[in-house]
Amino acid sequence: CGGTYSSEWFFSKILHCLRVDPDVFDAAYTWLECCDYIPAVLTDTRPDQVRRSRCAAGHKAMYNKQWQGLPSKEFLGELDAKLGELRDRLYEESYPAGVSAGRLSAEWAKKLGLPEGIAVSVAAFDAHLGAVGAGVEPGRVVKIIGTSTCDILVSPTGQELVDIPGICGIVDGSVLPGYYGLEAGQSAVGDIFNWYVKH
């Protein structure tokens, strides 16, 4: 849906690395979004066992269960053969926020002053969780404004959805369980405002 894919998103960043520093690309076993990396570090989870965020996977990596998860090896290989080869080292499943990513490790419990073994949630993006905090519900648009702006809506998963040109994705469970999360907006808003101030 939406018909767009940003240079800021998952596969664009990986492809950029492959083209500007192939040695780094070749040295990497897999790739993680920051929101997946932090819970993995806090829970001392191996890279091949990280529970990937549905929010990040769906909105930035084109993950959709109806399409067998991430884009196929063949699709990615059309962009670059090495990107296609990477597909097997990525992931098959994604999880909504609220699902356990694991338990807080002893090391991080000590550093943070928290009890060892408490649950650490699978992550979601700041705007999507901000929409939850702002009371997003069907029929209500929430606009999150910061370094970017995101317009977040939800629609029950039982409803048929139509293609909406220009949005950043429709992802099952990316905002609330049992709802599609719909995201639109403008990236780099804070940087653009800063540019205007300086110029």
What do these predicted regions represent?
Residues 110, 114, 118, 123-199:
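Catalytic phosphate/nucleotide-handling subdomain of diverse soluble enzymes
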Residues 2-124:
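Gly/Ser/Thr-rich active-site cleft segment
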